[in-house]
UniProtKB/Swiss-Prot annotation:
The keyword ATP-binding applies. It holds the Pfam family tRNA-synt_His. Its EC number is 6.1.1.21. One of its GO terms (biological process) is histidyl-tRNA aminoacylation. GO terms for cellular component: cytoplasm. The gene is hisS. It comes from Pelagibacter ubique (strain HTCC1062). It catalyses: tRNA(His) + L-histidine + ATP = L-histidyl-tRNA(His) + AMP + diphosphate + H(+). Transmembrane segments: none annotated. Belongs to the class-II aminoacyl-tRNA synthetase family. This is Histidine--tRNA ligase.
Length: 465
């Protein structure tokens, strides 16, 4: 390949590599979340990254004329297949396919990457890891949804957040659906209304942005136009007034629609069960939470942080929701012969990691390896004998792989890798049956080398790691 045709390395917008400390932190976060899911009685499930497009549904898209516009879809022979955009739709397919063998209620958790063909932004990725927990089956909805709320709060505390650093916002879609009925909004506009409301806390929206989406169109700062729901001024005004209400009692007095009253009662029942536990102060009603996915039809939850983060340019940004979900009574019943309700929630791990790294509150005991320097190639067998002793004693260790490089270059590599100690043995050490260690984290200018009998290797090296 000539110079003119050399490739320029880079990533598509909305994707990132993770390595080193960031990846170790992410794995610790995942392990903490998983341990808490298991503690709450959830069992693991794994499904493929691809699903048949008609099975996964088109619950994400804002553009009705192109229902698969927000996902990555491909032609596979006679069928279209789609990279999963969440873990709930694959769960619905799995339950419909295996419901005879599953214990119901089925409490499952799943961790896996999802893909969305959306506009990228601060802590908004087009590929990200979700950690889901769902309860599927005919159960008491208040109990199941309270279990999810308690799980969210408990997990965030286990991850290292403090009680005043997050809020679990809960609502019920039936409340606003009742208002939509009273306003005689046509069926073809209902999902657009829901998605407009869901944008309320998104950057650049607020009440004004939502009102634009409820009416004819919204033009963002870049000039991009999003078609609105084409409501009348009165319809849009009444929805905006609804979004300003904060008190459940006030809502109960003003909204008399039976469906709205049903949603309010379900919220009251949920809050009563939540009050039996330890997390009532972290769980708040917020009637603007409706969730943008079309399959939710009752309880909704969205968890936000009470602090801002800074992007790579040092500018304060809103992180957005780090955990969300809700109740879906018809997602599974789309499949023939199955009518099973469900409720669930999902942590956006990459967004949560972004927040935790901002706080510097997640610590990792990262055990860097001991490095064995190769001073003389004729003693290579001896170096590998030392390596075996270290690894047999569960000490992270490696041998330098290029014996042609001098000691200085080997130590430069070790320092770049942040190795705590180097084994430096040459002809004298092997003749005297001794080992020399160099403390690579020691104070510069001091004597950081120590020579001792070979049989003391493990005891001496443990002083440095």
């Amino acid at each position: 390949m000539n110079k003119e045709n050399k490739l320029i390395p880079g990533l598509p917008s909305g994707f990132e590599d993770r390595w080193g400390k960031k990846l170790i932190l992410k794995k610790k976060l995942i392990n903490t979340i998983e341990a808490n899911f298991v503690k709450f009685g959830f069992g693991a499930l794994e499904t493929p990254s691809f699903e048949i497009s008609e099975n996964i549904g088109s619950f994400l898209a804002d553009d009705d004329s192109n229902p698969m516009s927000d996902v990555f879809s491909f032609k596979d022979g006679e069928k279209n297949i789609t990279l999963r955009y969440d873990l709930s739709s694959p769960l619905a397919r799995f339950v419909a396919q295996n419901n005879q063998e599953l214990p119901l209620p089925y409490k499952r958790y799943q961790m896996g990457d999802v893909w969305r063909n959306e506009k990228a932004g601060n802590a908004r990725y087009r590929s990200f890891l979700q950690c889901d927990a769902d309860i599927v089956g005919n159960v008491n909805p208040a109990q199941a949804n309270a279990e999810l709320c308690n799980l969210i709060a408990s997990t965030l505390l286990a991850c290292g957040l403090k009680k005043d650093q997050f809020v679990v916002n809960i609502s019920n879609r039936k409340i606003v659906q009742g208002l939509i009925e009273d306003l005689k909004i046509s069926d073809d506009k209902k999902i657009k209304v829901m998605r407009a409301i869901d944008k309320l806390d998104k950057p650049g929206f607020g009440l004004r942005g939502v009102e634009d989406l409820l009416k004819e169109e919204r033009v963002d700062a870049s000039g991009a136009v999003t078609k609105g729901a084409n409501l009348t001024d009165d319809q849009a005004s009444q929805i905006i007034n609804f979004l300003k209400v904060k008190d459940l009692k006030e809502l109960k007095e003003n909204l008399k629609n039976p469906l709205s009253q049903e949603g309010i009662k379900e919220l009251e029942d949920l809050l009563e069960i939540v009050s039996y536990g330890d997390y009532l102060d972290q769980i708040k009603t917020n009637f603007t939470i409706v969730r943008g996915l079309a399959y939710y039809d009752g309880f909704c939850v969205e968890t936000n942080l009470n602090f801002k983060a800074k992007n790579s340019k040092g500018k304060e940004v809103d992180i957005g929701s780090i955990c969300s979900g809700g109740q879906y009574n018809k997602l599974i019943s789309r499949f023939k012969g199955v009518d099973i309700p469900g409720t669930g929630m999902s942590f956006g791990v990459d967004r949560l990691l972004f927040a935790m790294m901002q706080l510097d509150q997640i610590e990792v005991d990262e055990k860097k390896p001991v490095i064995i320097c190769v001073m003389d190639e004729k003693y290579l067998k001896n170096y590998y004998e030392i390596l075996k002793v270290l690894r047999d004693n569960n000490i992270n260790s490696e041998i330098f792989l290029d014996s042609k490089k001098n000691l200085g270059k080997q130590l430069t590599y070790a320092n770049k890798k942040q190795c705590p100690v180097a084994v430096i043995c040459g002809e004298n050490e092997f003749k005297d049956n001794t080992i020399t260690l160099k403390n690579l984290l020691g104070v510069k200018g001091e004597n950081n080398q120590l020579t001792f009998p070979k049989e003391n290797l493990i005891n001496e090296i443990k002083k440095f790691i």
